[in-house]
């Protein structure tokens, strides 16, 4: 489970999901009040061995779902899920698709000892001049994965209500304090500049 932290903006501003911290601060309440209903829904649909996401607003003690997805998700959760739980659901689904009836190796994992966060870095219009800090981040212990969606020389033109994503950095740490320090390190060392030198 995760929460979504949005960048601050006025009503009608472009949508920027800055990060997804794991696990959600509402996880215990979700497990106690709602999880059995969601599981019952999927079982009732006859769905087996799949990956699904549900997005919800938490309002006045209730989870109000507004989206369900069956793709592998934009945050690429397979990059951190195995580190956190020991479960590689990609391997399980591949084995199941190839006919292995015993491929469902999922276990109940209500909590993990590590903490995780996915940081998104969005781009404004312009031409990418330089991407700084990738090497420094790649050697930092708590940086699990760096997904790069642009390269120097690319032209960025935001034509929708969502800015183009330039980078996504997945972090896994042993404690909240280590996670906060890693976020600070990433924000200090990582930068994307346009050809005019603007950050």
Residue ranges and their predicted role:
Residues 1-47, 51, 58, 69-97, ...:
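ATP-dependent carboxylate/phosphate-activation module, predominantly the ATP-grasp catalytic core
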Residues 48-60, 105, 199:
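A short glycine-rich, hydrophobically flanked beta-strand micro-motif that places a catalytic Asp/Glu
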Residues 55, 59, 85, 110-111, ...:
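Flexible domain-boundary/linker segments
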Residues 64-67:
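Protein kinase-like catalytic core scaffold
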Residues 94-199:
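Peripheral (often C-terminal) accessory segments that flank ATP-dependent C-N-forming ligase machineries
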């Amino acid at each position: 489970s995760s929460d979504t932290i949005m960048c601050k903006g006025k009503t009608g501003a472009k949508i920027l999901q800055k990060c997804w911290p794991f696990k959600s601060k509402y996880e215990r309440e979700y497990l106690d009040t709602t999880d059995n209903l969601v599981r019952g829904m999927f079982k009732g649909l006859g769905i087996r061995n799949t990956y699904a996401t549900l997005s919800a607003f938490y309002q006045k003690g209730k989870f109000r779902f507004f989206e369900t997805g069956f793709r592998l998700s934009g945050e690429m959760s397979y990059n951190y899920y195995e580190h956190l739980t020991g479960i590689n659901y990609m391997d399980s689904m591949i084995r199941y698709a190839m006919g292995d009836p015993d491929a469902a190796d999922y276990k109940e994992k209500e909590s993990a000892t590590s903490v995780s966060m996915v940081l998104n870095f969005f781009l404004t219009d312009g031409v990418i001049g330089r991407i700084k800090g990738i090497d420094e981040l790649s050697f930092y212990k708590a940086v699990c994965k760096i997904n790069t969606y642009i390269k120097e020389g690319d032209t960025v033109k935001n034509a929708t209500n969502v800015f183009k994503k330039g980078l996504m950095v997945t972090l896994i740490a042993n404690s909240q304090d280590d996670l906060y320090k890693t976020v600070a390190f990433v924000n200090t060392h990582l930068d994307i500049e346009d050809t005019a030198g603007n950050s």
